[in-house]
Each structure stands twice: as structure tokens, then as C-alpha cells.
From Swiss-Prot:
Function recorded in the entry: Part of the Sec protein translocase complex. Interacts with the SecYEG preprotein conducting channel. Has a central role in coupling the hydrolysis of ATP to the transfer of proteins into and across the cell membrane, serving both as a receptor for the preprotein-SecB complex and as an ATP-driven molecular motor driving the stepwise translocation of polypeptide chains across the membrane.
Cross-referenced HAMAP family: SecA
Self-association state and partner proteins as the record states: Monomer and homodimer. Part of the essential Sec protein translocation apparatus which comprises SecA, SecYEG and auxiliary proteins SecDF-YajC and YidC.
Name of the protein in its database record: Protein translocase subunit SecA
Binding, ATP: Q87, G105, E106, G107, K108, T109, D515
Membrane topology category: Peripheral membrane protein
Lineage: superkingdom: Bacteria
Cofactor(s), names only, from the UniProt record: Zn(2+)
GO biological process: intracellular protein transmembrane transport; protein import; protein targeting; protein transport by the Sec complex
Gene: secA
Location in or out of the cell: Cell inner membrane; Cytoplasm
Keyword Acyltransferase carried by entry: no
């Protein structure tokens, strides 16, 4: 109440910010006549003048009014478009490192030019991040005219580009590209073997278009670069025959033993997207595996040596019960292609990790591709937080404002519209069954079609879009279908979705980034005419004029019919996605309307609100085909959506907390790697490694502050001679001396070590040997880092079980991953020193050949793939941590001893004795820990 009163008196935070920005708008507008009077050459010279002023110490904030006024004037001359005042506000919000929420059709692309131009003056690079290559290329070409006119260079970073083209794109003042490509380039830059092979500059400033889609929807899963691992394809085929032999349990068993409607062998938890074997299912699966010869007599499926079987069985169960054809994926030729759940687009080249993709391939009977080993990985949260300044724009960010602030430190500012919105959002209509719902949708579409009103129908899956298309064909209503299967025609279909009587079916937000103009997009059509080389210039001009006249007539006709009508056939689990669909209508003050048609069969209602709504319908004795249209039901659905959004936020937050641990380690490894790459001679670094290795070795035989009787000098001599090629007569030295300190012996060892090292360098020369050392360090660091990533994956997958031991899984993960990281650094240090000391090289040519071979072995990774999964094991861990289920995980959490990472990499689990330390890393004996479960 008090908060509301204060808002009335002082205005909300958003209103106060807008008021501050409006004061600057007045300054910019006051400069307009001055810049209008300048010639083209004088206006273009302003960019260099701004750069000189910036170099002398003037800030970008001080340059803002003039720079915005110059950009606006240049846009009027080059683009024939003048920035509205609200677009100037949007530009200032972006420059301040905030998120600008601008309604669809308010000109986000043009708004961004202001902040991009101002920040490009600094010469440190500006990245404009889009959701796909098409938009990156379109915006770079479209806005590139303006930037080039102002003397700025523009690059576009595409997936298909060659290495030198990418370097040129990043060297430009402004670089357009997709979120995935920027992230993958960062990872690839940290895998190169020569500093000149890098493409990115330090990350300075990024503007993320459709920021909600990139930083929230796609942030649940990491970017992964992977290479081929061990072949388990036959095991996937054999496991695929098991799920059909098991029956699904209906209902989840509660603590009091109730809740199970129909007993079965496994239970599917749709909320957490997981499958769990019941006790009966566990026994049945063991019997099947025993008969198949995959499990030995008397062995448990949960025994450590059978973890691989467990992993494959769960992958197969999930493939059969949670992932459905034409909803989560499509089959094209001999390939399973993932469908993006948010856009409905096909994600070519992407694969689910953790064996899930192979399990789906086995289910569909297509060729099973080998599993991959992670070579490098990062989450979008941690990639984008590396930019010195980050900003974003979208039509729908306000519902996620808290998350943007909490995770990225980004404030959301809602920008006022240039014209008052005219769209009417009608009440949801809820039907008992899907059939009744679709009947109502067809009636609504027919009504609009007969009145000449264009309709955009939103569906949540390819399956539903094809079902609706079938129903419209039966009803003899012409229409266009826009889903992942029609990706190539996407922009063309969306551009014409505003023509009279046009009915367009779209999965979710496919076609985002292309405006739906009432009467159709005349610019697109004119573009096709201008690109037709068979026409003369006169004919092109005549046809374009004719198109513009026709468009004006169609535009007025559609406005009179009520503008674009949006039909939602199902609520998405996020209110933001629903708002995006609604936002396609009523752009720039145009008329428009929207309505959602729901049924109690919808997944969202079934899981979260179905019983409550069904009870209301039964109480009201609703006849068949009659919808319920009430605020209480809509509020009930929004409450369900808020629950899902809250849960997804928790998953992303937990994902980030886990990845922050790996991120700290990633930063240290990449920093060390960059030091090696940039150093002309890494001799000092090698010396530090060498000294610490031999001090540690010496102390293993001669403990600090120990008595002479405790020294094992003969053993130390033998180890130095046999393992390191270093001869030191330690026993003789002690025998000849009346008394000697251990520090004197250490000095003697170090001098002998340095003498051997100096001899190796002298053989081939310092310059050649430095190159060899650099190659060895990079090879060792990269190999051990990959093994470390595999070990972290395994640790992460089972860590939530620590909750049962009253331990905080996140703290346990931090502790154990830190121990693993310590081992990683020890392994690198020991391996580098050992290779340098044991290498037998007679000539400079041999040394150079060895260096080249090392780099070639590492750079020629087989089957390298770039993945950004829809839902990965990382997100599952976060979900498991938030809502623990009493099942044993499919993979061991962690293995003690130096062989753990290598074993994890090969997918092998060593047999564990009852009195050995438990593989989970708890520190307990196996029989007292996970041995109980076996």
C-alpha cells in the first residue's frame, strides 16, 4: 500500500528514467537544424572529429547528444528514415548498458544504430548479436549502408565463413553475428596453437537483439565443442529393445504409499523432464539384461562396473517416453534433427548430449553416430558477462526483468510506444477437449477469412501445426504453414502474412525479426522485382510503382477489417512467448486483435491447473462445445505459467551457480594458455614448473624437518636417474660430509637438473627449444583440460545425491571440483617437465618435426561438432538439485586417484573393492557409502 502511494507521488523507477532521458532528447532535437544545414562531406567528417575528441579524453556520454544527432541526420539522408524521440530514448538505454523493451514494429533495428554508432567511435569493436544468420546478414546489409556512409566498417560473422573472413569481420568497427557463433569463436580462440590464428578482439560492447530469447530461453544449456569418443553404438541398439518390454507407471508414489493409479516399471516426471525406474522395473530390467548377456549373474545394475549400462538404459527410456517425433525432433533421411522448442526451427548440426541423441537414433532406426567427448564448453551467461558493457532489446522483457537484473546485472527499461496501441486482447476460451477447441479455432478463422481479415495462428509444435493445416484443408480454407520444415521460405511467408484473407500457421515465434505489415510487405515484393535481371530499369520502376499503389489499397482494406488477428491454439509455459505472439498484431498503432483457445488436454493445464479448471466446468455444468470464458480461469492459467517460469528461473540460476565453478577454472586455464601463446620464450614459466616438480620429488624422499635416518637418498638417486635422466651422487655426498643440511642436498639436485636442461637447450639452440616447450605445454594443458571437463561432467551428474547425506550439493561440488583442478595443474606440471627431460633429440630438424607433430595431432580432432543443446545434463543436474528424487544416478560422481579423468574419458569405470574409497568422492569406504545401494 505504501509502495503504491509512493509510486503515485514520485512515479515508478521506469517513469523517472524516461523523464531523465527525455531531457537529453530535447538537447538532441535542438541540434537537428544545425546538422541539417551541413553538407554530406561535413556530416561525414564528424565521425573522425568525434574519434579525435574521444582520444583526447572526452567521454562517450559527453559526445552522446551530438553523435545521436549526427546518426539521426545521416539516417534521414541515407535510409530515408528519421529516428522518433522514443527511439532516441531506446538508443540511450542501450548505451547505458540496459535492456530496452520496445513493442513489435517500433523499429528496434533502427534504434540500435544510435548506440552502435556512438560506441563504435571508441574503436574497440561493437558486436550486434542476433538469433540467426539470416537476421545477422539482413541487418548488416541494411544498416551497413548507414555505417559505411558515416565512415565506419561493418563485418558479418557467419557460420560458413573461412578463418580469414572471420578475422576481417571481427576487425571491423561493428560486427553482426549470432549468439552461437560469437560463443563458439571464443571457445575456438582458446584452442588455437598460434596467436595469429585468433579471430576475436577483447570483448568490449554487445547489443543483443531478442535478448530474452538468447539470454533466457537459450541459457538453460551450454555451448559445447566436442570430438569423437569411444564407440558404444551397438549397446544403444541393444538397449533400444528394452523400453517396449517395460510398462509405464501412472501417478507418482507419495511418502504415504498413495498416488499410484496404475503400477508399472518406470515413472515419467514431466515437470522435471526425467524418467525413473521403480523397484519392480529395476528387477525386470536386470532380468532382461541378464538374459541378453549384458549383466553377469548375481550383479546389480547399480554396481559401479555397470554404470555404463545404467547410463544407456536411462538414455533409452528417456528417448522413448519424453522425446517425440515431430515435436522434439524430426527425421530427415538418415538423420535425427532437433526442433527448437522456442521457435519451432530445425537445429541443423546440433545434438543432444549424454547419449540421448544416440538413443533417439536407435529408437528411429537411423544410423547411430558415435558419442562425443567435450573439448570446450561455456554457458551464454558466462560468455556474455565477459563483455565490458552489455545491452539488449526485445519486445517482451518486463516479465523477466528480475532475472535479467539478478543474473546479468541488466536493468529493464520499458520504452513508450510512438503511437497508442490499438490491439484488443480478448479473453481466453477454454474447452473440455482438443476437438472442441479446434472446432472453435476453425470457426474463428472462417469468420475472419470471409471478412478479408488476415489471421496468424500460433501453435506450440510442428505436430499441432500440421494437424491444424489438415483441419483447414478439410474446411477448404486456403493457408500457409510456417514451421521448421519450411525454414527456407520463412521470411517470405511472414512478410506477406498481413495481406487480406491470408491465413498463416506458425510454430511459436518462427519468423521473429520480420515485420508483418498490414496489406503485405511491399518492400519485400519490390526487392524481388529489382533483383529480376530479365527486366529493364523502366519496367522495374513501373512494376514497383504499381505494387505501391496496390499495397495502399490493400492496407486500408485490412485496417477496415480489423487488422491482423492472432489466434493462439495453446498457452506456452512462458507468458513472454504468449506476449510475443500477441505482439505480432497492432504494430505502430495499427488495429489488431488476439485470442487464445485452450483445452483441458493441453500440457500446461494438465500438469499445473487442469483439475481446478475441470472442477469449475463441472460445477457450471458446461455443455459440450461451450467454452468457459472467465477471469478466474485466465488467472489460474497465468498462475501456472508463473510457477513454470519460477521453476525455469531456478534451473537457470542453479545451472549458473554450478557453471561459475567451472568458469573460474576456465578463466585460469585460458589465462595460462594465453600467456604461453603470447610469450616469445616461455622459459620462465617452464623453469617455475621444473623447480616445483623437483622440489616435490625431493621432499617425497627427504621430508622437510626430518632426521637423516629418514632420508631415502638411494631411492631418490635411482628415480632421478631412471625416470628423469639426472645423475646426482647424493649418497656419496652425504658419506663424504661430516654433517649436511637437507637444503644443501636440494641445491645439489637443482644444480644437476639445470645442467641437464642447459645441455638439451645447447644441442639445438634456445629459439628452437623454446618453440618445442611451447608446443609441449599447449598439448599437455589441452589434453588434461579435456579430461578435466569429462571428470567435472561425471561429478556434476551425481552430486545432487549428496543432499541425502545432509550435505549441500553445491558446496560439495565446489570442494571436489577444486580438488580435481588442483590435480589437473599437478598433472600438467609433471607431464610437461617429464616430456622435456626425457625427450631424446639429436638435431634442430628433429625438434621442429616433434613440435609440428604435437600441434598436428591436437589440431586434427576427429568429428568436431558444435552443440547448443535444447536441454542438457547440466540443466538436469540443476533440476535434480532443486527437486531430489531417490534414484541412483546414471553415472558415477567422481573417481579418486590420478586415473579418474582418463577413466571418465574412456567411459570405463574401475571395479571398486568393498574397502576402497567410494567413487563418489565422499571420503567414505565404498561399503559404507554407495556400496549399500549395490
Amino acid at each position: 500500500m505504501i509502495t503504491g502511494l509512493l509510486k503515485k507521488i514520485f512515479g515508478s523507477r521506469n517513469e523517472r528514467l524516461i523523464k531523465q532521458y527525455r531531457r537529453k532528447v530535447v538537447q538532441i532535437n535542438a541540434l537537428e537544424p544545425t546538422f541539417e544545414a551541413l553538407s554530406d562531406a561535413e556530416l561525414q567528417a564528424k565521425t573522425q572529429a568525434f574519434r579525435e575528441r574521444f582520444a583526447k579524453g572526452e567521454t562517450l556520454d559527453a559526445l552522446l547528444p551530438e553523435a545521436f544527432a549526427v546518426c539521426r541526420e545521416a539516417s534521414k539522408r541515407v535510409m530515408k528514415m528519421r529516428h522518433f524521440d522514443v527511439q532516441l530514448i531506446g538508443g540511450m538505454v542501450l548505451h547505458d548498458g540496459k535492456i530496452a523493451e520496445m513493442r513489435t514494429g517500433e523499429g528496434k533495428t533502427l534504434t540500435a544504430t544510435l548506440a552502435v554508432y556512438l560506441n563504435a567511435i571508441a574503436g574497440l569493436g561493437v558486436h550486434v548479436v542476433t538469433v540467426n544468420d539470416y537476421l545477422a546478414q539482413r541487418d548488416a546489409e541494411w544498416m551497413g549502408k548507414l555505417y559505411n556512409w558515416l565512415g565506419l566498417s561493418v563485418g558479418v560473422n557467419l557460420t560458413t565463413m573461412a578463418h580469414d573472413e572471420k578475422q576481417a569481420a571481427y576487425a571491423a568497427d561493428i560486427t553482426y553475428g549470432t549468439n552461437n557463433e560469437f560463443g563458439f569463436d571464443y571457445l575456438r580462440d582458446n584452442m588455437v596453437y598460434d596467436d595469429s590464428q585468433r579471430v576475436q578482439r577483447p570483448l568490449n560492447y554487445a547489443i543483443v537483439d531478442e535478448v530474452d530469447s538468447i539470454l533466457i530461453d537459450e541459457a538453460r544449456t551450454p555451448l559445447i565443442i566436442s570430438g569423437q569418443a569411444e564407440d558404444h553404438t551397438d549397446l544403444y541398439r541393444r538397449m533400444n529393445s528394452i523400453p517396449p518390454l517395460l510398462t509405464r507407471q501412472i501417478g507418482e508414489e507419495k511418502a504415504d504409499g498413495t498416488g499410484v493409479e496404475k503400477p508399472g516399471d518406470y515413472y515419467v516426471d514431466e515437470k522435471s523432464h526425467q524418467v525413473y525406474l521403480t523397484e519392480a522395473g529395476h528387477e525386470k530390467a536386470e532380468q532382461i539384461l541378464l538374459q541378453a548377456g549384458l549383466l553377469a549373474e548375481g550383479e546389480s545394475l547399480y554396481a559401479p562396473q555397470n554404470i555404463t549400462l545404467m547410463h544407456h538404459l536411462y538414455a533409452s527410456l528417456r528417448a522413448h517416453s519424453l522425446f517425440h517425433r515431430d515435436q522434439h525432433y524430426v527425421v530427415q533421411g538418415d538423420e535425427v534433427i532437433i526442433v527448437d522448442e522456442f521457435t519451432g526451427r530445425l537445429m541443423q548440426g546440433r545434438r543432444w548430449s549424454d547419449g540421448l541423441h544416440q538413443a533417439v537414433e536407435a529408437k528411429e532406426g537411423v544410423q547411430i553416430q558415435q558419442e562425443n567427448q567435450t573439448l570446450a564448453t561455456i554457458t551464454f551467461q558466462n560468455y556474455f558477462r565477459m563483455y565490458a558493457k552489455l545491452a539488449g532489446m526485445t519486445g517482451t522483457a518486463d516479465t523477466e526483468a528480475y532475472e535479467f537484473q539478478e543474473i546479468y546485472g541488466l536493468e529493464t527499461v520499458v520504452i513508450p510506444t510512438n503511437r497508442q496501441a490499438q490491439r484488443k486482447d480478448l479473453q481466453d476460451q477454454i474447452y473440455k477437449t482438443s476437438k472442441e477447441r479446434y472446432d472453435a479455432v476453425i470457426r474463428d478463422i472462417r469468420d475472419c477469412f470471409e471478412r478479408g481479415q488476415p489471421v496468424l495462428v500460433g501453435t506450440t509444435s510442428i505436430e499441432n501445426s500440421e494437424l491444424l493445416s489438415h483441419l483447414l484443408n478439410q474446411a477448404q480454407l486456403p493457408h500457409q504453414v510456417l514451421n521448421a520444415k519450411q525454414h527456407a521460405r520463412e521470411a517470405e511467408i511472414v512478410a506477406q502474412a498481413g495481406r487480406p484473407k491470408m491465413v498463416t500457421i506458425a510454430t511459436n515465434m518462427a519468423g521473429r525479426g520480420t515485420d508483418i505489415v498490414l496489406g503485405g510487405n511491399v518492400e519485400k515484393q519490390a526487392g524481388f522485382v529489382m533483383a529480376d535481371e530479365s527486366l529493364s530499369d523502366e519496367e522495374k520502376a513501373r512494376r514497383v510503382t504499381q505494387l505501391q499503389d496496390e499495397w495502399q489499397s490493400l492496407h486500408e482494406q485490412v485496417k477496415a477489417a480489423g487488422g491482423l488477428h492472432i489466434v493462439g491454439t495453446e498457452r506456452h509455459e512462458s507468458r513472454r512467448i504468449d506476449n510475443q505472439l500477441r505482439g505480432r498484431a497492432g504494430r505502430q498503432g495499427d488495429p489488431g486483435s488476439s485470442r487464445f483457445y485452450l483445452s483441458l488436454d493441453d500440457q500446461l493445464l494438465r500438469i499445473f491447473a487442469g483439475d481446478r479448471v475441470r472442477a469449475i466446468m463441472d460445477r457450471l455444468k458446461m455443455p459440450e462445445g461451450e467454452p468457459i470464458e472467465a477471469g478466474i480461469v485466465t488467472r489460474s492459467i497465468e498462475s501456472a505459467q508463473r510457477k513454470v517460469e519460477g521453476r525455469n528461473f531456478d534451473i537457470r540460476k542453479q545451472l549458473l551457480q554450478y557453471d561459475d565453478v567451472a568458469n573460474d577454472q576456465r578463466r585460469e586455464i585460458y589465462k595460462l594458455r594465453n600467456e604461453i601463446l603470447e610469450a616469445v620464450d616461455a622459459g620462465d614459466l617452464v623453469k617455475n614448473l621444473r623447480e616445483s616438480v623437483f622440489v616435490e620429488l625431493f621432499r617425497a624422499y627427504v621430508p622437510a624437518e626430518s632426521m637423516e635416518e629418514q632420508w631415502d637418498l638411494a631411492g631418490l638417486e635411482k628415480t632421478l636417474r631412471d625416470d628423469w635422466g639426472v645423475e646426482v651422487p647424493l649418497v656419496k655426498t652425504v658419506e663424504q660430509a661430516q654433517s649436511i643440511e637437507d637444503e644443501e642436498l636440494l641445491t645439489q639436485v637443482q644444480e644437476a637438473v639445470e645442467a641437464v636442461y642447459a645441455g638439451k637447450v645447447a644441442q639445438v639452440g634456445r629459439e628452437s627449444f623454446a618453440g618445442f616447450e611451447r608446443s609441449v605445454m599447449l598439448q599437455s594443458l589441452d589434453t588434461h583440460w579435456r579430461e578435466h571437463l569429462a571428470a567435472l561432467d561425471h561429478l556434476r551428474q551425481g552430486i545432487h545425491l549428496r543432499g541425502y547425506a545432509q550435505k549441500d550439493p553445491k558446496q560439495e561440488y565446489k570442494r571436489e571440483s577444486f580438488e580435481l583442478f588442483g590435480r589437473l595443474l599437478d598433472n600438467i606440471r609433471n607431464e610437461v617437465t617429464r616430456i622435456i627431460f626425457t625427450v631424446r633429440i639429436q638435431s634442430q630438424a628433429e625438434l621442429e618435426e616433434a613440435s609440428e607433430q604435437i600441434e598436428e595431432d591436437l589440431s586434427q580432432l576427429t568429428n568436431v561438432q558444435y552443440k547448443h543443446d535444447e536441454f542438457s545434463e547440466l540443466a538436469e543436474v540443476a533440476a535434480g538439485d532443486a527437486e531430489i528424487h531417490g534414484e541412483t544416478p546414471p553415472v558415477p560422481a567422481h573417481r579418486s586417484a590420478a586415473a579418474s579423468a582418463a577413466a571418465a574419458l574412456a567411459g570405463q569405470v574401475p571395479k571398486v573393492g568393498r574397502n576402497d574409497p567410494c567413487p563418489c568422492g565422499s571420503g567414505k569406504k565404498y561399503k559404507q557409502c554407495h556400496g549399500k545401494l549395490a
